[in-house]
Amino acid sequence: MPDYDLLPLLRERLLGTYSALLADTTATLTFTAGGIATWTVDVEHGRAAARRGAPARPTTTVRAALPVLTEVVRGERPGVQAFLDGLLTVRGNLALALQLDGLFDRSHAAGGDDARTYTRAVQAGGIETFYLEAGPVDAPPVVLVHGLSATNASMLPLIPALSKQYRVLAPDLPGHGGTEAKSAAHAARYLGDWLLAFLRETTDQPAVLIGNSLGGRAALEAALNSPADVRGLVLLCPAVAFRKLRQLVPFVRVLPDEVAALPVRVPRRMAMRGLRGLFADPTRLPDAWYEAAIDEFVRVVSMRPNRLAVFSALRHVYLDEPFGESGFWDRLPTLTPPALFLWGERDVLVPAGFARWVEDALPHGRSIVLPDCGHVPQFEHPERTAELTLEFLAGL
């Protein structure tokens, strides 16, 4: 048998494994080691089996040098870290790759179980919620919440740094990634209530919420609604209520969420242009990361319930009343948990100018504008974002 054959190791690692998360899944994941060889893992009803070769259209394709693939399968190198380090690329269903990575036993690897990123699911507010977990199980909980039309994979850059000291949980929002959509009305308060339900199912102590964009708004709503459950907040370019540019409110208000049920296909080129536009300098990120993100976006919006959820969330953020008894900006001063706001100097979606309004509403909060940064600081400036986050956490 050639020494570059990964099949025996794949079979050894997958022998006897079962994933409840994959119980209803039939899929194929292909490992490709350059031009050397290809192996496929067939997933069916929670179990996985390996073989040589590749199907014509695999669900997911993982590419890396053979030594990297070998280390990942052996459990010596977390697949998430290999992806973040640019040593491994994923095309297709990224969530499937994360789930399969969790099947490889890494209990003997350096760092023990605390170095792992697990995939899990829980019922939160009646919604089957898919989430990632990393770090010591008895450490203080930190919850990462992603933005609109993304998945928990968009929070991956923060997990390695935070999971050394904290128990990190990263759920998919309802109607995103692996979390089901049960309601068409995905207003910010609804997402805040769902997030509180998730906390109560997964933790027994107050958690720090770290949210990007819509995830930041959901975190704010959770803290406003139930401050006793929230130890602190780190808001990365949070989707606050519009104070101006509300001319289209009458039209958007009568536009039903069901419009999104139409099977409209978003051209990949258009989606890519929109994604790259979120960054101050799109060249900072490898092309492989953009491709993986677009694959996830296409997968999410290809399903009707998810399209409804994404459109509903977008519509409700725009329609949010800025002022008045139920208005966001008049409720914000009642926020009591400590909060750190990070804004992107060149954010085209949530302008950094919102920082001064937040500072007026929350004199006890802290706002930092990150220079040369767009809407996704955890990807564009991961080290600085992690550094500021850890400093904030240490002060709680």
Q: Model regions: which residues?
A:
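Flexible "cap/lid" loop of the alpha/beta hydrolase fold
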Residues: 224, 233-265
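Short beta-strand/loop motif that positions the catalytic acidic residue
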Residues: 335, 341-343
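Conserved alpha/beta-hydrolase catalytic His-Asp/Glu region
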Residues: 266-331
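Feature captures hydrophobic
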Residues: 1-119
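Active-site loop/oxyanion-hole signature of alpha/beta-hydrolase fold enzymes
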Residues: 124, 170-210, 214, 246, ...
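Acidic catalytic loop of the alpha/beta-hydrolase fold
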Residues: 322, 346-350
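Conserved HGGG/HGGXW glycine-rich cap/lid loop of the alpha/beta-hydrolase fold
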Residues: 127-178
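Alpha/beta-hydrolase fold catalytic core
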Residues: 95, 99-142, 164-166, 203-205, ...
